[in-house]
């Protein structure tokens, strides 16, 4: 029953569906969700971080075991054999809880080995800036939609005001400005909205200047059709980010694919739900 579909040509209007989610600790009773997703027949599925919980960045072989035990599940095989899968990481599959990698591409010394294991296990079109500038950011297109998948861990340094690091930030700004797609989807492993996380401790609100730099670019360059995706909090939310000098931005967050642990709903959200397990 395995099959694949060719994506609509870049720039061509087409009907298709894309799923996304995060928060996927290996949890045998909940692994059936991959079969459920496959049954919905999305054209692609975006894994937005915490795709596994390795939390042991210096143990490469153990990381591989964590990947392999998921990949050997019949339910996951059904999804990955029939659906284009794209992935970025968040703290638990990059390093440990709330980790920041820092601006040095090669320090701490576990960063590059973790990146190499990640590359072994996900079929992304490319991985950041390659050997000289490792990371998991990349972009791809389906029809008239451009997807920009960002890496908010490898170069994160809140003390220096950055989530992306200078190279990735330049890449994102140039890609957004050059895009002629009707819709531009920017995906992040952590939340964009200021009220969505624990006071900005582990979200874009922890680097408000860099966040504003990206949003101001959208306003000033009149970049239409931007949609924000995120994960991390164990619930599903929809937020509206008001932009007085441009159009309001909408953020869609979901991150409880297989996890048992749940975060409380948010009154500030347009929609917030945390019962059971889910994807969007």
Regions found by a protein language model. Give the residues of each.
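Metal-dependent phosphoester/phosphodiester hydrolase catalytic core
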Residues: 1-280
């Amino acid at each position: 029953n395995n099959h694949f579909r060719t994506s609509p040509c870049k720039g061509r209007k087409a009907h298709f569906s894309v799923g996304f989610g995060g928060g996927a600790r290996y949890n045998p009773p909940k692994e059936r969700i991959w079969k459920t997703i496959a049954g919905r027949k999305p054209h692609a599925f975006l894994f937005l971080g915490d795709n596994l919980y390795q939390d042991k960045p210096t143990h490469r072989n153990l990381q591989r075991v964590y990947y392999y035990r998921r990949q050997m599940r019949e339910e996951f095989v059904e999804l990955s054999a029939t659906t284009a899968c794209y992935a970025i990481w968040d703290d638990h599959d990059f390093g440990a809880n709330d980790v920041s990698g820092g601006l040095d591409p090669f320090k701490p010394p576990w960063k590059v080995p973790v990146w190499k294991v990640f590359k072994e296990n996900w079929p992304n079109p490319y991985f950041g800036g390659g050997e000289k500038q490792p990371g998991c950011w990349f972009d791809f297109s389906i029809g008239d939609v451009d997807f920009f998948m960002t890496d908010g861990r490898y170069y994160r340094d809140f003390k220096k005001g950055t989530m992306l690091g200078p190279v990735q930030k330049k890449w994102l700004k140039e890609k957004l400005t050059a895009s002629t797609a009707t819709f531009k989807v920017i995906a992040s492993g952590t939340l964009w909205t200021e009220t969505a996380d624990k006071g900005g401790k582990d979200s874009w609100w922890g680097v408000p200047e860099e966040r504003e730099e990206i949003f101001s670019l959208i306003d000033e360059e009149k970049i239409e059709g931007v949609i924000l995706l995120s994960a991390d909090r164990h619930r599903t939310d929809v937020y509206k980010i008001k932009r007085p000098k441009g159009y309001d931005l909408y953020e869609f967050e979901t991150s409880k694919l297989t996890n048992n642990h749940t975060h409380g709903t948010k009154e500030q959200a347009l929609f917030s739900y945390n019962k059971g397990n889910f994807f969007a």
